[in-house]
Amino acid sequence: MNTYIKIDEHGNMLFTENKQEGINSLIDNKQENRNLFIEKNKCDKIDYLISIVCGVIGGAIDVFLVGAPGNSKLGKWTDKQIDNVVMKFSKLNGWNPQEQNKNNVKSAIEYLEKKFKVNYDQSVSNSASAIGLTPNNHHMKSLAHSPDIIGLFFSILNQFTSTSTFLSDGRLITMDTYNQSLQGHNFISKLFCGVYNWIGHLMSDFAGSSSSKGRGKGLVMPFYELFNLCNFGKFNINDKKGTMADVAIKAFENGYDARFGITMAIPVVMTNLLIKLIWSLRRLIQFKAPIRECIPTSKHSDLRLMLLIGNGTLCFVDAMDATIRSGGNFL
């Protein structure tokens, strides 16, 4: 006796001894078959192809439009947007420039530097020189200049205790500074003023210094300062050997700051958006899935795999380009 598959109105597979009934059930329940296929969340060859193509597109954007700081087409656009943000923030805090300085970001930065002074902003002194602190790397080594929770903690600590805290050569170093009088009548108000002072000072450094030539040295990417702890390894840096911390510092000095970090994120965002868009359209148009099942969320294992493949392809293209450009140097 032969057994045939039958699918009921709910899309469940049953077994029947009637061959014609099983065949008719399969024919009459095409939508249930589609739903069964979708619910399995398995990638097919088209999904793999989509992921790879999207990754290559992201890689091409990275190679031809991102490039390196200083000659990046997307980087110039990103820098301009950051300049606009800094000028808008300055206006919100009282910057009222003359007509000739309305679009002058240096004027806006100078205003913020004067308004949001901090005690830990020294970059040149005898003590600073002893730990290798320079105007080019003090945003990297000074923990209070980091745009993350670590930076906030050390900024409040330094403002309340009149100190500066640095990471250098794998060591945590604290220096005494001049006394800074925080505004506010009690601890809570002083804490609030300290937080806002930190934000304002970060904005004054976001687009570089008012005295710097060119784009200047901005802020580090969030948690990038922790590379200062990596005082190990031997890597080629312009015909010299250096630790991982030295590589990170040199990269920051060469323009890999938070602004360029935003630029480098654009190919990643584009790759993810393309994969999610095509994945959603395919489910909606080809598989006739309900709209709620076409929303790209992490619960879909096939989408997670597609994103992994797409980003892996992007990283591979980027790594190949970096290897060719570097010629064996890490920078």
Predicted regions and their residues:
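Glycine-rich, hydrophobic membrane-spanning regions of integral membrane proteins that mediate transport
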Residues: 1-331
